[in-house]
Amino acid sequence: MLNELEVTQVTIPLPFRLDHVHCFLAEGEKGWTIIDTGLNNKVTRDIWNPIIEKHDVNDIVLTHYHPDHFGYAGTLQALTGADVWMTQVDELAGTTYWEPGSLQFLKGNYDACGIIDDKASALSSDEISFITQVKPYPTVNHHLEEGMKICFGKYEYEVILTPGHSDGLITLYNKENSVLFSTDHILPRISPNISYWFRGINNPLESFFTSLKKIQKLDVEYVIPSHGTLFKNANKRIVELLDHHQDRLNEVYENMKEPITVNTACNVLFKNLSIHESRFAVGETLAHLEYLYSNDQCSKFKREGIWYYQSI
């Protein structure tokens, strides 16, 4: 399929359980275009260097601000002189999240989730460890907006905003071939992490549901994700994701007849995780709790510095 689209997939290894990210390379209107970049580390550099030596890269499109997509963009821009394209909301997130003004609140936020002190410190340290893997930041030259058209390889793609996994996440859609570069919005085997990170949209799970239903209306046949393999029938996978999260919401709701902390709810949903994985689990648990709160299914109150949620 990628050959037919005249697109090259560039797979970058990641040092996590989710062990890779797919970036993409194709000819654009004025030269070569790269979609996403990987972390800023030696593994990524060694993969991109021979590629950019052979291709005149004019544009770098960033689908969202998470480190595995955004991290190497600044260095890649410096090496190629390419323009960087990104949504304005995720440009702001990506260039402020790993700065002292944000990082100083990390441990306090984890404390407020009811997480014990040592683990709260470890979670904060894990987050801070990504600073070197996202800097230098790119200079964003153009802001991506809903409905924009991008020439990539043989075809033109429409930018579709799909907030949920991040507030400014985009997907790219070609109607002619019923193809969607789904980025991290729809993945074939795992559910994208939908987390509330104590800032931005305070009900990201609601945004994710809305974005899934938005794509569902397109009835996409071919889905090219940023993690995992190409698959067919987007709508089948969308139904599976909606059902999965509804099951999670039901599970949380059944366990909050008495006041429950974010940490306790997290332990209901997730087991045997590393510190890195636990950080995402906390964010995803909080997103589910905030969904229930926003939909008037539970109350929320703070006692002795810790947030509690209780079903209504």
Where do the language-model regions lie?
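Short, well-ordered beta-strand micro-motif
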Residues: 25-27, 151, 158, 171-173, ...
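Short hydrophobic/aromatic-enriched beta-strand-loop microsegments
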Residues: 81-86, 181-182, 277
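Active-site HxH/HxHxD metal-binding segment of metal-dependent hydrolases
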Residues: 49-150
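Conserved beta-strand hairpin/beta-sheet module of binuclear metal-dependent hydrolase folds
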Residues: 2-55, 171-183
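C-terminal regulatory/interaction regions
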Residues: 251-312
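Divalent metal-coordination and catalytic microenvironments
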Residues: 26, 36, 64, 87, ...
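Metallo-beta-lactamase
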Residues: 32, 39, 130-135, 156-246
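Short N-terminal helix/helix-N-cap motif within the alpha/beta-hydrolase-1
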Residues: 43, 65, 70-72, 167, ...
